[in-house]
Regions:
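A structural boundary/capping signal
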Residues: 1-152
Length: 152
């Protein structure tokens, strides 16, 4: 089985390849990845880790001033972030240029004050209920299926 870092890096690279091929143009969801896409990226990566490796993860969000950010927290306490480099043009304490981070809470992530309890990513997040698939579930499903087409 691939390690978590390798899976996260491959997932990110795949999103970038699909974006380069304009797969997400006009989707209003992940077309600007990684900028402004930390939440959606976590939803999709969390699903991928669960389905492909049985790895449980929690959607973790925090704020610092007017900035917000989302990353995954794993059962062992490690965090996974594939969008941190969206802060590479920031200055001071918000500067961060790692495209993929897997490990213990680092200085950058610890600056964010959690604004809610982490929420586990489960199949219920992408399984339509008795009313059917809602608009956001549909967008995420299409993005996820597109990403999977690019994973070798």
């Amino acid at each position: 089985m691939k390690d978590i870092y390798q899976m996260a890096a491959e997932f990110r690279t795949t999103i970038l390849k699909a974006r380069t091929n304009r797969e997400f143009s006009g989707d209003g969801l992940i077309e600007r990845f990684p900028s402004g896409n930390c939440g959606v990226a976590c939803d999709l990566l969390g699903r991928y880790l669960l389905e492909q490796a049985g790895v449980r993860s929690w959607y973790t969000s925090g704020v610092i001033g007017s900035e917000s950010h989302v990353w995954l927290t794993l059962e062992n306490g490690d965090i996974v972030d594939i969008t941190g480099d969206q802060y590479k043009n920031q200055s001071g304490s918000l500067y961060y240029d790692l495209p993929v981070y897997v490990g213990r809470m680092d200085a950058f992530h610890s600056k964010f004050r959690l604004n809610s309890n982490p929420v586990e990513i489960t199949p219920n997040d992408w399984t339509p209920d008795f009313l059917g698939e809602d608009r956001m579930q549909r967008k995420k499903r299409i993005a996820y299926e597109t990403i999977l087409k690019y994973i070798g």
